């Protein structure tokens, strides 16, 4: 017992030591588990430092040279990275025209190494895109330069051909002598103060080889060439007249295009000069192309043949000064195109164009809204023809010694019953709507002008129609000359005058019936606005069952129009149109 410990005590010590070892191992495991998360985080921290540039290599006493080389390498890498980044940003944007265009002055020479480095810095795809854009720009520039050169060559050829044709026409006119002048040779056209050139002489035989399109193209080419010539500046007094002339030119040329497009014969038939009924171009009558050229040049007086009447020329001169004392001005021209015809319902029709200008004076009183003889509301061509007829009647009755050229284009009195109306058809043949245009007046800034001197307005009439060969207008030869006669003007006024609605005859009223004595109360006639009295004789219209005084409705149906004054239905059956009773 004394030599050693007992067996139970040894077992207890062994168990205690084993328990201590196990507890220590558990503590170590717990500490390892706690430090594992920190270790992983700490292991990641150097990589984060390298990304942020916070960690640097450890320096040693013997590594001074190595550190300088490393810094130099890092600086080179950073500069290369920056250059590549900037190049990518520049290549992302589309190149501008200025960047693609060659430099105006040679750039400063650069070293080969620097150029190669910048070229290598641009990606291959971006370099190809840049080269493609530059090639496209160069091709577009070449096409633009070639088109400009072609336009210049075309303009030069047109000018040379115009000069050659003018030279040939001068030779023909000089060799023809007096005979060519009798057949309507064209003289030099002069604007106020300077010449605008010579229109190519085109007789009836020379126009036999050209159609309507060539004829119109020749006229427009001549007008375009005349624009390039130097013209004298228009004085302020003539500005309104020149503007009016060019406005008439635009309206007339537009209706020529309408006439050409509406005719189906211009593709196969030839075009002749607008001439008189005899086929010869008389002295004083100008061709339509010369008429347009004179209007475009501002020669309204010469284009409308107003210079043949000194009184009308004086009125136009006064109208330019916008004087109230000058009388009304009426200018009138008619043209026909014999070969530009077409078939209409089995009948050949010939186109004609009527151009008219009428001056209108504005009233300065408070009654401007009231219609007057010179009111701008007179917008129908018959107003112009009526004034011309009245003017001619007065001129011919003054003296028997009056010349044939002094009996038109002058009107001192205008009837008060002239009213506006729409354009009507000529003899039932297809007629396009005429053009009626007003030019706004222009006032002068002059303090010396009194209140009664007001500006003028101008009404422009352009009428285009297709008439048959046996139409009375074509059988009036003076209408296509500079001296239309009084009878022909009356004929034209009756043809294009205001169309009245159809009226009933006395026989139609007798057959209509519907007469009865009135037996009601508290009603009145809507024609005379009088109350009906007992046993008043009334007439009831069968179409609408409206009734009126017999005398009132009979006068309305026979003088005004054959329709009900209340509902506008047909009044009584006429001899040509049978009635259809209302169900």
Curated annotation (Swiss-Prot):
Gene3D superfamilies in the cross-refs: Zinc/RING finger domain, C3HC4 (zinc finger) (3.30.40.10)
Modified residues (Phosphoserine): 580
Alphabetized UniProt keyword annotations: Membrane, Metal-binding, Phosphoprotein, Zinc, Zinc-finger
Basic and acidic residues composition bias: residue spans: 70-80
Record's subcellular location: Membrane
Zinc-finger keyword on record: yes
Polar residues bias spans: 1-38, 156-165, 172-191, 384-408, 420-452
Gene Ontology BP terms: ubiquitin-dependent protein catabolic process
UniProt-listed CDD domains: RING-H2_EL5-like (cd16461)
Zinc finger residue extent: RING-type: 525-568
GO molecular function terms attached to this record: ubiquitin protein ligase activity; zinc ion binding
Region described as Disordered: 1-39, 53-124, 156-197, 362-452
Cellular component, GO annotation: cytoplasm; endoplasmic reticulum membrane
SUPFAM superfamilies associated with the record: RING/U-box (SSF57850)
Ranges of Low complexity composition bias in the record: 88-102
Classification via PANTHER family: RING-H2 FINGER PROTEIN ATL51-RELATED (PTHR45676), RING-H2 FINGER PROTEIN ATL66 (PTHR45676:SF41)
Protein name: Uncharacterized RING finger protein P4H10.07
Taxonomic source organism: Schizosaccharomyces pombe (strain 972 / ATCC 24843) (Fission yeast)
